[in-house]
Amino acid sequence: MSEQKPNKKPEKKPDITFFHPDLLEAPADGRAPYLKGYRCKKCGQLDFPKLSPCPSCWGEEFEVVPLSRRGKLYSFSDNFIGQAGMKTPYSFGYIDLPENLRIFAQLEGAPGSFRCDDEVELTVGTVRDNRDGVPLISYKFRKI
């Protein structure tokens, strides 16, 4: 008689969330959330996200700099076929901030409504659902 093995479910890997405290600060006092830039204490280069060591001088000490909440849409793409957990259609874009940084982010609003050079502002919202259908919250930008 052959030995029967119990049906074992494969272990579920933990889901990856897009929210990370090194990227986004939501102040407890109710002030508006902001993205965190990192300025190298050695050479002054500002980056988002944090790049360690500093790509300019190899410095390893940084200060957190709150980034502007507003910027200009440099480029964007409307997506009609998405990855698992993302409701289609949706848009992504590159946003130029006054600090001379270019940020990649999901855009909040109807695809087809965006134009290059649109003024946009930081917001927080659902970027997708995890495998369990739980919304994952992170930063996005929307037209002003």
Swiss-Prot record:
One of its GO terms (biological process) is catabolic process. Keywords: Acyltransferase, Aromatic hydrocarbons catabolism, Metal-binding, Transferase, Zinc. Pfam families: OB_ChsH2_C, zf-ChsH2. Pathway: Xenobiotic degradation; toluene degradation. Zn(2+) binds at C40, C43, C54, C57. Induction: Induced by toluene. It catalyses: (S)-2-benzoylsuccinyl-CoA + CoA = benzoyl-CoA + succinyl-CoA. Optimum pH is 6.4 (for benzoylsuccinyl-CoA formation). Its EC number is 2.3.1.310. GO terms for molecular function: acyltransferase activity; metal ion binding. InterPro entries: ChsH2_C, ChsH2_Znr, NA-bd_OB-fold, Thioester_dehydratase-like. Component of the BbsAB thiolase complex, which catalyzes the thiolytic cleavage of (S)-2-benzoylsuccinyl-CoA to succinyl-CoA and benzoyl-CoA, the final step of anaerobic toluene metabolism. The BbsA subunit critically contributes to an induced-fit process for productive binding of a CoA substrate into the active site of BbsB. Heterotetramer composed of two BbsA subunits and two BbsB subunits. BbsA forms homodimeric subcomplexes. Both BbsA and BbsB are essential for enzymatic activity. Belongs to the BbsA family. This is Benzoylsuccinyl-CoA thiolase subunit BbsA. It comes from Thauera aromatica. The gene is bbsA.
